[in-house]
């Protein structure tokens, strides 16, 4: 019997699933480029709406809530902390939920609904508790979109192409991170709240349309079973799409991480999870992987990356005001040189990770940041020459920030994939990837939370120049840990260990 029009419509909208009836646009909706673009737009929306609201928060608290000026800073900080805290708490929850569901689309849409609710509450809210709940919902949305989005990317492109994919996505979303605060302040100044939230709802509409249309490859393959003659990229697994890059990365990993005896069995034994695991480890199977120092170092790299970003976010506006008497709009312009190189060089460094491995890129990037951060001691109050010096050093910092984006995510994904390959029964069919990126999102959010606090305390107690000296020392320590653990222990250290 031919399927009814209603069945076709429900299948197309993914409301009802009948694998004997293909949804409209199956090929392009399950295409690698469309899936990755959907993830990129989701992450862009999250960061854009976060940045769009931040410059408006002080005015919202004063005009709509009536917060006195002397309590404004503490309330703004509290709303920022509510966002970060919710991301920390809900990231692992999002990972566990996603790995227990048959598809990624449902939790991906759940995150968008949380963001929609948050935006409506921010637009209409006129009390502090409502604004706090709205920021918590924004944090919940961030936890889901980053956790599910990164897991979906890995499943779509495979580990061999993950570096350049993440680099390209981060490059794209950095546009939102750069433009949103400037646009939010400008729209509020010219149009008030309707203009700010009008563009927010427009971007949410585009994001919703893409998320409802996207079809995961593993879901699309179930439709293709009834039509094996279909010509799509569905029959090409991520491993087949790596154009030899995985062979190169595998060879490098073998060179760096292979036991000195060269035994494949011994290599796999390092990733073997014993059968004697507590109940919580079977409920959350990513937990045994946390004993791996490489994975812990990958998380540390993500934490330091976020802490550096939070450091710049917290100090650039105050330095611009203290040194050069800049207002909020001109302070925002100083973020452009910092983010421009991230936008341009993100895909290149992602390609370098896929081509040369995580160790050289992470070590070089963090080592490069050491002298650049130390040189940030040079700018002082003054005229155009000092402004140009500060802007130039921020641009150089942007190069380093572009280099540290991809290695931690790619390294963590590669390690957990190895655990999954050696212990497929322990992890189940879906694997622990959403749990992995849930933890990664949690660590990153913690870094974003600590970064501004640490930067503010250090700047007040020892000065801006010495604060950057401390951050440079942290980058040097991180580079050393990357050299030892990321990509596997170097042979010379492995021999000494034996």
Question: What do the PLM-derived regions correspond to, one by one?
Answer:
Residues 54, 293-336:
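Extracytoplasmic gate region of multi-pass secondary transporters
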Residues 89-125, 129:
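Conserved MFS/SLC helix-loop-helix module at the cytosolic interface between two early adjacent transmembrane helices
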Residues 102, 124-129, 158, 325, ...:
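Helix-breaking motifs and short loop linkers at transmembrane-helix boundaries and internal kinks
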Residues 106-120, 360-375:
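Structural signature of the two symmetry-related core transmembrane helices
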Residues 136-173:
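Cytoplasmic helix-loop-helix junction between adjacent transmembrane helices
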Residues 144-157, 403-424:
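Intracellular juxtamembrane helix-capping segments at the cytosolic ends
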